[in-house]
Every structure is written in structure tokens, then in C-alpha cells.
Design a protein with these regions (language model features):
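Proteins enriched for Cys/Gly/acidic motifs involved in redox and nucleic-acid/cofactor modification
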Residues: 26-56
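Active-site loop-to-helix "anion-binding N-cap" substructures in soluble metabolic enzymes
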Residues: 1-34
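Short, well-structured alpha-helical patches and their helix-loop capping segments
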Residues: 4-8, 25, 45, 70, ...
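Enzymes that bind and transform nitrogen-containing heteroaromatic metabolites
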Residues: 10-18, 30, 50-304
Length: 304
């Protein structure tokens, strides 16, 4: 597989050929290279981060109760996989409701998990459908607590809780619109007086459709190539409506809620035939849970 960067793609091969060196392109390794290079290719060709949407849901498709409670839907093993993924990305994105409901830390904490959770990944990797080498590497990886992805909060919350894990240090950014910012600080002195330590980015856009473009530009400016979108439903819907989710990693637990919050609150489709059909789909068992992973488009996408 040639380097997707058009500035260098194929030049090394050509130099070798010019020097009389035989070069063989190992096509059998294409799937492996494609799985590992998707994010890099998008970043190089389109200048935007690669967005991975991770959700844990019940069998009937709920990520939380109507109260907002979501602890815990998935098993220890599945949550450990999420910490492995946090070790692989540059940023973790949440919306204001998740920020208020969960007080998330968004860091890598292998010490939170039992030996049983770790041992579930030592029993071999059983991937069905398309064999995904990114997932294989993720399953084998050890979560590294020294890696701290950038914490990203989208939207201005109604208030900042005392002792918020999100604001424990300076490795974060808050992205909101000027309209939302002005409305919230006018109503709440807690927000007006809070020290965001120059890590608040306020966008001038009024059109909601431009929100995600602004967010992606901010992430790029922070050096983010891969970002995990951890939700909740509202921010997932915002990214989904904008066509900005590249990879879906959905964990399904054998629980039935009966009612609750869906993973994506996006614009409805009139017909099921209009629903997004994913490519290169892989499924895997993680303890008692099932992981389903797929991509918005195939690897052979080009510059937009």
C-alpha cells in the first residue's frame, strides 16, 4: 500500500525502481495497512480528524435511562476496551449533558479493572465478518495510564459542578457558539466567573450545520488526528447529521431497558432504505457483550 500523502506517495518506490531495485507491492497486506491508515489518510487528504463514535447500549438500543443514568450498561471487559481505545486516540469528545450527568474523567485507568476483565482479552481474538486489524491491535494493546487524550467538551453547560473531573488540569478544551456562551453566562454567575484558563473556544457561527466544521477545525488546530466521540445522544446526533462520524464502535449488552435514551438523536429518515449502511463490518464477543464495528465509507475514499 502506497503512502496516502500525495506529496510522497510512490516516490520511494520510484527511486528504488530507478536504481534498478525490484519492488513488489504485497497486496495481501493491503487490508492490514488500510485498517491502520484510515485515520491518517483522512487527516492528510481532507485535513480533518478521524472520528470514532463509541457507544455502549442495551439490547433494545438505549445508552441510558430517561434519568440520564448509564452506569453500567456494559461489562468490565467492554469498559476496559474503551480505556484501551483512549490510549490510541488524541482526544475524547463529550457533550454538555454527559459532562453534567457522569462527571467523566476521560482518562486511562487500568487500575479500575479486575484481572478477570484483562483475562477476557487473553483468550484469543474471535472477530467475525471482515477481519479488522485495527481491532486486533486494540484487543492486544495494554491501556497506558501515562497517555492523556485531550478532553473536549462541546457546548456550554448550565453550570460547572464543584470538583469536576473534566477541569482537573489544563489538558482540555471547551467549544461552544457565541450565542450559547452569551446566553448561559447571562443567566449564571457560576459560568461568568469560572476560570477556563484560556481553553474556551467560542465560535461565531449561527448556523447549527456549521458547528461540526468549526469543531473539527479546532481539533485539527490542537493536533488531533484521531478522536473518540463518547456521547451522549445529542452530540452524537450533531456529528451524525453532519456526516462526520467515520467509524462506529457499538457495544451491545444483554440488558433490556424498555425505554430510555437512544445512542443517536439525529435527523429522522423517512424510509429505512435511507439509513446509513456501514462498510467493512466486524463483530466480536467481549465477555458477555457483543461489539459491532463498521465504517461510513470504504478505504478507497479520496480527497473531497
Amino acid at each position: 500500500l502506497l503512502d496516502p500523502n500525495p506529496l510522497v506517495s510512490g516516490r520511494g518506490v520510484q527511486r528504488l525502481l530507478d536504481c534498478g531495485v525490484d519492488v513488489e507491492i504485497m497486496h495481501k497486506f493491503f487490508p492490514m495497512a488500510a485498517d491502520l491508515l484510515r485515520g491518517f489518510k483522512k487527516y492528510i487528504l481532507r485535513g480533518k480528524p478521524f472520528i470514532i463514535n463509541k457507544c455502549a447500549m442495551t439490547l433494545d438500543g438505549k445508552i441510558a435511562a430517561n434519568s440520564g443514568d448509564s452506569r453500567w450498561i456494559s461489562s468490565d471487559s467492554s469498559r476496559l476496551l474503551v480505556h484501551k481505545l483512549r490510549s490510541k486516540v488524541d482526544a475524547v469528545i463529550v457533550g454538555k449533558n454527559t459532562f453534567l450527568n457522569d462527571n467523566p474523567s476521560l482518562n486511562v485507568r487500568p487500575g479500575d479493572f479486575s484481572e478477570e476483565a484483562f483475562s477476557s482479552f487473553d483468550m484469543g481474538i474471535n472477530l467475525t465478518g471482515r477481519y479488522n486489524f485495527f481491532l486486533e491491535e486494540l484487543f492486544r494493546a495494554k491501556p497506558d495510564p501515562d497517555i492523556e487524550p485531550l478532553r473536549v467538551l462541546i457546548g456550554m453547560p448550565d453550570y460547572i459542578p464543584e470538583g469536576s473531573n473534566f477541569f482537573r488540569d489544563d489538558n482540555y478544551v471547551v467549544i461552544t457558539s457565541k450565542k450559547s456562551y452569551n446566553e448561559k453566562i447571562a443567566k449564571n454567575s457560576n459560568l461568568k466567573n469560572f476560570d477556563f484558563r484560556q481553553r474556551l473556544v467560542v465560535g461565531e457561527y449561527d448556523d447549527p450545520s456549521k458547528e461540526v466544521d468549526f469543531i473539527l477545525e479546532v481539533l485539527k488546530a490542537h493536533g488531533v488526528m484521531h478522536a473518540m466521540l463518547e456521547g451522549g445522544s445529542g452530540i452524537n446526533g450533531t456529528f451524525f447529521n453532519a456526516g462526520a462520524i467515520d467509524m462506529f464502535m457499538y457495544i451491545i449488552a444483554p440488558k433490556v431497558a424498555g425505554n430510555g435514551i437512544p445512542p443517536i438523536s439525529g435527523a429522522p429518515v423517512e424510509k429505512i432504505s435511507d439509513a446509513l449502511l456501514l462498510y467493512d463490518v466486524t463483530t466480536a464477543s467481549i465477555g458477555r457483550d457483543i461489539l459491532i464495528c463498521g465504517y461510513k465509507e470504504q478505504y478507497n475514499f479520496e480527497m473531497m
